[in-house]
C-alpha cells in the first residue's frame, strides 16, 4: 500500500508519496491539465504499484476537487480521505502541505484502513 498526500490548487497539484515504511518515494508538482495529470497517474500506476496493489490518498476539502476524487478511482486509489484545510502559517508551502498530508495519512494508516474514525478526517468511498 502506498500513501499519497495531495495539495490541490486550480492549476497544479503537489504530491507527496510514501511507502509502507513511511519513506517519501516522490515529491513533485503536476499540472491539473487533463493530459498532464493523467500522464502522471498512469506512470504512478505503471511504475510504483505492483500487481493488485493500490494506494490511499488524502487531500484538503475544497470547492473544486470532486473531479480529482472521481479520477483517482481510475488509477487504483483504494480510499480517499478528506481533511479540513490546516490553518495558514508563515512557513506554509505546497510541498510542506503535501508532505504533512501524506505523513498524517501514514501515521493513522492502521485506523483508517480498518475503517475506524480519526478526529478531523472524513473518509470517502469511491
Give the residues covered by each predicted segment.
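Phosphate- and other anionic-substrate recognition elements at nucleic-acid/protein interfaces
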Residues: 1-126
Amino acid at each position: 500500500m502506498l500513501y499519497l498526500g495531495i495539495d490541490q490548487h486550480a492549476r497544479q497539484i503537489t504530491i507527496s508519496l510514501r511507502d509502507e515504511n513511511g519513506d517519501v518515494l516522490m515529491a513533485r508538482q503536476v499540472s491539473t491539465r487533463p493530459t498532464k495529470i493523467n500522464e502522471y497517474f498512469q506512470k504512478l500506476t505503471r511504475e510504483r504499484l505492483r500487481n493488485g496493489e493500490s494506494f490511499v490518498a488524502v487531500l484538503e476539502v475544497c470547492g473544486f476537487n470532486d473531479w480529482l476524487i472521481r479520477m483517482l478511482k481510475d488509477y487504483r486509489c483504494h480510499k480517499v480521505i478528506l481533511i479540513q484545510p490546516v490553518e495558514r502559517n508563515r512557513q506554509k508551502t505546497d510541498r510542506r502541505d503535501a508532505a504533512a498530508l501524506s505523513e498524517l495519512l501514514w501515521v493513522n494508516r492502521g485506523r483508517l484502513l480498518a475503517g475506524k474514525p480519526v478526529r478531523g478526517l472524513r473518509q470517502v468511498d469511491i
